Every structure is written in C-alpha cells, then in structure tokens.
C-alpha cells in the first residue's frame, strides 16, 4: 500500500534527524521567548503555493477557504507550529487554508509576531480568549495541563470566530497532519453538529465517576442514544448549527454540575461526551491516530493502530518535543520531527 511505503520513508528520514542531532535542547519557557534577541523558530523552508486546480481565495469570509482552529500558548507553541507546518506541506491548496489561532489576551501580540515570522504568507487571524470565561467553571483533573483555561477554548469557537465562518476543523497542538486537510474538510456531517472518529468498543463508563452512573438524573442523559467515545482533539464542527442550538451553554451547564457534584475527572472531554456522544457524524479513524503520548500519568510509548494514517496525535501526557529533547524518545516521535521548526542551536 502506498501509505505504508510513504510512512516507511518518512520514519527512516526522521530517525536520521534524531541520530544526527545530539544537541537537542529543551523548549524555552515563556520568559525566554519574550526576551530572546534572536528567533526561536526557523522560517518555514518552503513557499506554499496553490496548484492550478485550486479556487481563488480571499479574506476570511471567502467560501472556498478551509478553516482550521488551533490554540496557541508558549507551553505548546512548538507543537502548534509543527502542526501548521505539516498541514501546509501536505495541502494541495495551502493558500486556501485559513488558520484561526486562539490565545490568552496577554500573549496575542507576541504570538502573532512569532507566527508571521515563521509563516510570512500564512492566512490567519488570532483571537483573544479571556481565561475568566471559564476559570470559575474548571475543576481539578488527573493532569494539570487539562485544567488550563485555553484547553476549554474549543467550546467557544462559535463565539470567537467571525459569524461568516460556518464550519471549522478544530485541531489540538500535539499532532501532525500527513494528508491533504481538504479531505477532512469535505466530510459530510449530515444533520449532526460535529464529526469525529468514534471508538464504540472503548469502555465508556470509565470517563465518568461511579456517582454519575448511580444517579439517574445524570446517567439518564444518555437514554435513547448509543454513546461512543470520541477524542475532541480532532473535530469538524458546523458552527452555524452550533450557534443556533446554543451548544456552548449546554457544555457550560455540565461544567457547573461538575463543580458541585464531581461527575468526571478528565478536563474538557467529558462535557463534550455528555452533549454530543451518540450524535456524532463518524469520520474515518485514519484522521485521528490518537494516544501516541501514552496515558495521562506515565506517557508510555505506544504503537500505531492498524490501518492507513492521515493524522498522528500525541494525546496523553508524553509530548514528542519533550521526549526528544530529554533524549528519551519513543520510536513514533521520529514521525513528528520533520515538521519541527524550532531552532535547536538557540
């Protein structure tokens, strides 16, 4: 199969990069990024131009654009830059991809300048997300990263993005795309609000506490539907239907209940499961080879799931840039390396 041959070549090249780069350094903290006299990232090496078959693209409201939303923060910035780079490298029409970056207010100017220095011709807007929007709704989680306000920004895309943007692909920062993103964009949602790869054989009960399942007023929310697990790091969202149905308020309602009753442990995921599980347009699993970051505690190494691959996702506690810099990489981290634009000699 072509995808196997392609991945074998990519894997070999990436392993060579790791072996030949012994001086990998840890990604700098926010203070270092703000005070650095030289660029933290290299400029993207390629000029990304549309092919002849691509439609002309203009401003954010142009109907021919593919809209992609990603959060930006200094802790995961290296991952976000790699994700954007991967999308551009594999897009047939890279100039037709419009990026919507969500960042906390005090970092937007810094991050906007940085993105423009790496991708000078990139079409994007950056949006302020006020942490106060969700701070009073967030409860403690199994991993501190899951408690960060920006992790909840995906619930507010319908409010943050321009009203003319009626559909968006939401992507986490710890992934790379190895296929044309337009294929994911064209996914039919039918009557559904969101589309995502579903995993109906997963143990759904573990995502909620025993107290949740013992209370009919909570567990009854799944009556009449077949709930399946889905990972919220890769979603196609119909923003027009989301706005019309007030789905942000529905998610906030469950977050308020969680603050009082403690019905789950996993950050921003369970409210999405409560609102949408059983009502998700299924997308091929090739678009979210998730779990490559291991579990939420140890971050152990994982293998690829069987089948073709269009997107690699390091969900879990282990991130490829951290493991690479600490010289304790997992084998599959080599597949992330070709998209990394961080200046290792910095």
Swiss-Prot record:
Membrane topology qualifier: Single-pass type II membrane protein
Glycosylation sites noted in the Swiss-Prot or TrEMBL record: 203
Example of a GO cellular component annotation carried by this entry: Golgi membrane
Membrane topology, Lumenal segments: 22-346
GO MF terms held by the record: polygalacturonate 4-alpha-galacturonosyltransferase activity
Main localisation: Golgi
Pathway of action: Glycan metabolism; pectin biosynthesis
Keywords assigned by UniProt, alphabetized: Cell wall biogenesis/degradation, Glycoprotein, Glycosyltransferase, Golgi apparatus, Membrane, Signal-anchor, Transferase, Transmembrane, Transmembrane helix
Compartments in which it is found: Golgi apparatus membrane
EC number(s) per entry: 2.4.1.-
Gene Ontology BP, a term: pectin biosynthetic process
Residue spans crossing the bilayer: 1-21
Family stated for the protein in its record: Belongs to the glycosyltransferase 8 family.
Matches recorded under PANTHER family: GALACTURONOSYLTRANSFERASE-LIKE 6-RELATED, GLYCOSYLTRANSFERASE 8 DOMAIN-CONTAINING PROTEIN
Function, as annotated: May be involved in pectin and/or xylans biosynthesis in cell walls.
Protein's name in the database: Probable galacturonosyltransferase-like 6
């Amino acid at each position: 199969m072509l995808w196997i041959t392609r991945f074998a070549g990519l894997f070999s090249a990436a392993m060579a990069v790791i072996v030949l780069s012994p001086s990998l350094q840890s990604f700098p903290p926010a203070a270092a990024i703000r005070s650095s006299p030289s660029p933290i990232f290299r400029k993207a090496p390629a000029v990304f131009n549309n092919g002849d078959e691509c439609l002309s693209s203009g401003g954010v409201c142009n109907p021919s654009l593919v809209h992609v939303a990603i959060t930006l923060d200094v802790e995961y910035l290296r991952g976000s830059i790699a994700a954007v780079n991967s999308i551009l490298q594999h897009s047939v029409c890279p100039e037709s991809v419009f990026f919507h970056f969500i960042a906390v207010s005090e970092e937007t100017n810094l991050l906007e300048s940085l993105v423009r220095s790496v991708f000078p011709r990139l079409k994007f807007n950056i949006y302020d997300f006020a942490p106060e929007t969700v701070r009073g709704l967030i409860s403690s989680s199994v991993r501190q990263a899951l408690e960060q306000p920006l992790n909840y920004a995906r619930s507010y895309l319908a409010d943050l993005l321009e009203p003319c943007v009626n559909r968006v692909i939401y992507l986490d920062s710890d992934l790379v795309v190895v296929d044309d993103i337009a294929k994911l964009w064209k996914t039919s949602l039918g009557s559904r609000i969101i589309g995502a790869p579903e995993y109906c054989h997963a143990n759904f009960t573990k995502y909620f506490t025993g107290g949740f399942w013992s209370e009919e007023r909570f567990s009854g929310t799944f009556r009449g539907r077949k709930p399946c697990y889905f990972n919220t790091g890769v979603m196609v969202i119909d923003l027009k239907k989301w706005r019309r149905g007030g789905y942000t308020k529905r998610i906030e309602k469950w977050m308020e209940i969680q603050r009082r009753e403690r019905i789950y442990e996993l950050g921003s995921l369970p409210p999405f499961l409560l609102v949408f599980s059983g009502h998700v347009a299924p997308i091929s699993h090739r678009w979210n080879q998730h779990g490559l970051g291991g579990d939420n505690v140890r971050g152990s190494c994982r293998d690829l799931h069987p089948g073709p691959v269009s997107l690699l996702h390091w969900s879990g506690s282990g991130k490829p840039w951290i493991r690479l810099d600490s010289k304790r990489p997992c084998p599959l981290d080599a597949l992330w390396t070709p998209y990394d634009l961080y200046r290792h000699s910095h």
